[in-house]
Regions:
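Internal, charge-rich low-complexity segments
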Residues: 104-110, 114, 358-361
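Preference for solvent-exposed, low-hydrophobicity sequence contexts
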Residues: 1-108, 183-326
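Surface-exposed coil/turn segments at beta-strand junctions on protein surfaces, enriched
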Residues: 88-90, 157, 299, 392, ...
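A short local loop/turn or secondary-structure capping micro-motif enriched for an aromatic residue
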Residues: 130-131, 170-174, 246, 276-278, ...
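Beta-strand secondary-structure signal
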Residues: 36, 96, 121, 133-135, ...
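Small/polar beta-strand repeat architecture
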Residues: 109-133, 137-185
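Extracellular/virion structural assembly segments
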Residues: 2-5, 271-272, 297, 313-476
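Short solvent-exposed strand-capping/beta-turn motif centered on an Asx-Ser/Thr pair
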Residues: 125, 249-253, 404
């Protein structure tokens, strides 16, 4: 028995793209053969899934896509109260895959049949014990030895041969070959023939056109051309009130996130990766306390860059530039959203906004009972006929962005399709000191959108409608 790996995912792969394991086995043509794929939490006996697969038509390979299973094991990380850094264990799942196989417990013989005390003895390695019911199939389908064909009982057995309850005197040709199997079609199961260990599925989804060229080396932060786990453009405009929580896949241990502003001043925050993925707040409103002289952002700073630093004197990731947007706004709402690679970025909505409320209620008509006084029926003017209950209030907002670049407009699609979105309002004191409300979960109401191109529209802005996920309570 041997297996060959035909294909497997890369060790670090997004959970929302195909994660196919394809195996070949030398036993694939055996009767009742199936591949067994077992999936475990890495390094443990905690089995999260098991699949038995028939060989593919044509090549006989065993193929299993584990993406649906692993999607149930990843979620997202977000801590809006932290401005330092934190490990992001919910954004990834470590797993092992062990591939085995099963087949019908079938044994063949080619040696001559032997007389064993008047009964037929067959020479073949086997696992039978006395009393087992077996089915014998001869090469000639029982033409020469019809009494040996079919269902019989084992009356003696060793690991090398076995005897069945068939009189040897009925045998006319001792040279006929054949096979024998348990009457209940018992299977032989062999597990852990091929093992894949310490694979990582992270909360990510690549576009159809991008997935075929995906390489995990693009996201392992070791060189200046490596990317964080985000699709946020390398140049991105943010207001002073915006938050960014970006994920990265760095080496474990003590590292630095370096900030350099347009005046050339350099700052950093130390991180200590204990997990495969870390989340780092890097937005203008949430970069936190940095080591350096002065402040990262003041009235003279137009932009700042942020990158990952591991090796002394080296740049270990792309530089992500944050251009500071100081355009005065009528009112500002910021929407924080989960992007396609598991980071939380945000867009500011600085132009006119409209807040609307919707009330739903149940109304029923009740009989006015009134009262009897002085042998006359009467009622109070406060008595109610129509009554209402189950009153619910929901809030929605129409929001409009300011002008943005084409790259930002394309990235905006990820906000519109994000399953996790949060909104906050921002006010500015003297234009430079933002004060924010707390984040509230919301739902994007837009069901269609246009992807703008600058060749068709020089000035690009977006409009959306959101609805708060939670309703205010109404007393009765």
């Amino acid at each position: 028995m041997s297996q060959t790996t035909i294909a497997s995912p890369q060790t670090f792969s997004p959970a929302y793209n195909p994660l196919k394991f394809i195996i070949d086995s030398t036993n694939k043509n055996n009767t009742g053969f199936k591949y067994i794929f077992q999936v475990f939490e890495a390094g443990t006996a905690n089995k999260i899934g098991e699949y038995k697969m028939l060989p593919r038509i044509g090549d006989g390979y065993g193929e299993q896509d584990l993406s649906k299973l692993l999607q149930t094991q990843v979620s997202w990380d977000l801590n809006t109260t932290s401005t330092s850094w934190y490990n992001a264990p919910n954004s990834r799942y470590l797993y092992d895959v062990k591939v085995g196989e099963e087949q019908l417990a079938e044994y063949s013989w080619t040696a001559n049949l032997v007389n064993n005390g008047g009964n037929v003895r067959i020479t073949s390695t086997n696992t039978f014990v006395v009393g087992d019911q077996v089915i014998i199939t001869q090469a000639d389908s029982g033409v020469a030895n019809p009494q040996l064909e079919g269902l019989h009982t084992i009356i003696s057995a060793t690991g090398a041969n076995f005897t069945v309850n068939v009189a040897f005197t009925t045998i006319t040709d001792i040279t006929i070959n054949g096979t024998v199997n348990y009457a209940d079609n018992r299977k032989l199961i062999t597990l852990n023939v091929t093992t894949f260990e310490d694979f990582i599925a992270f909360n990510g989804a690549f576009r159809w056109v991008d997935w075929p060229t995906y390489s995990q080396t693009d996201y392992k932060l070791t060189l200046a051309n490596k990317q964080w786990l985000t699709n946020q453009p390398e140049q991105f405009s943010c207001t002073l009130g915006q938050d960014l929580y970006l994920n990265l896949w760095g080496a474990k241990g003590s590292d630095r996130i370096v900030f350099v502003n347009s005046n050339g001043a350099s700052f950093y925050k130390g991180i200590n990766n204990l997990d495969e993925i870390s989340q780092v707040p890097v937005g203008p409103n949430n970069y936190g306390t940095l080591v350096g002289t002065g402040t990262l952002i003041d009235s003279t700073v137009d932009w700042y860059e942020v990158y990952y630093f591991k090796t002394s004197g080296a740049l270990d990731s792309f530089k992500y530039r944050i251009n500071l947007d100081r355009r005065e706004s009528i009112t500002e709402y910021d929407i924080l959203f989960l992007d396609r690679l598991g980071s939380y970025s945000s867009f500011a909505f600085q132009l006119k906004s409209y807040e609307r409320g919707e009330v739903t209620r149940e109304i029923f008509n009740r009989d006015v009972e009134g009262y009897v006084s002085g042998a006359q029926w009467n009622y109070l003017t406060e008595d109610m006929g129509f009554m209402q209950n189950n009153i619910n209030v929901s809030k929605s907002f129409d929001l409009n962005t300011n002008w943005m670049t084409q790259d930002m407009a394309q990235y905006f699609e990820e906000l519109l399709t994000s399953p996790q979105t949060f909104v906050k309002s921002v006010e500015y004191i003297c234009g430079e000191a933002p004060t924010s409300s707390t984040y509230q979960p919301c739902i994007i109401q837009n069901n269609s959108y246009e992807v703008f191109k600058q060749r068709n529209k020089n000035l690009i802005k977006q409009s959306i409608t959101i609805k708060l996920s939670n309703q205010d309570n109404v007393n009765g």
